[in-house]
Amino acid sequence: MEHPNIITVAWTGLINTQPPRLSISVRPGRYSYHLIRESGEFVVNLTPARLIRAADLCGMYTGAKVDKFRKAQLTPEPAQSVACPLIAECPLSLECRVTDVLPQGTHDLFLADIVAVDVDESVLDGTGRLRLDKAELAAFAHGEYFALGRRIGKFGMSVARRDIKKSRKITES
C-alpha cells in the first residue's frame, strides 16, 4: 500500500465488555476489505460533526485510486498498538485486531478486540473521565448524517433510588 487508507463504515458497534470487542461490517468488494483481511488490524475513529463532509468524501472514493487522507485534508497519526494510522482530528480512536470474520451476505462481519484507545484531552473532564457529550460526534442512519447532542440519561436511571439519583446529579455537575 502506497498510502494509508480510510474507510467510512456505517455498521459498527461494541459487542463485548471483557475483553473489549467491537464489530464492523464491510463489503468484500471494497478495497479496504482486503487491507483489513490481510493485516488483521484497523482503527475505528469516532467522527465529530465538524468532519462529516470529510467522512462522507472518504466513503465516496476508493483508496485504490485516491489518497483519502490528502483528499479529505486529514492527518494520519501513528497508532500505539497497530500498524495502521488513526485520524489525528478525531477525538477518540479505537485500535483493533481482528479475531474472526463472519460472512453475512452482502457484507462480512469483522469481530475485533480493542487493543488500545486514543483519547484527545478535549473530551476528558477534570478528573480524566471520558465525556462523549464534549466530542460533538456524528452518526449515520438510513442515508443521513446526524449530530449527536447532549447526554439525556444514564444506564439504570429508570430504577435507581431517589437518593442515588440526587447524589449522581451533584457529582455530575
Give residue ranges: language-model regions.
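Basic, polyanion-binding surface patches
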Residues: 1-173
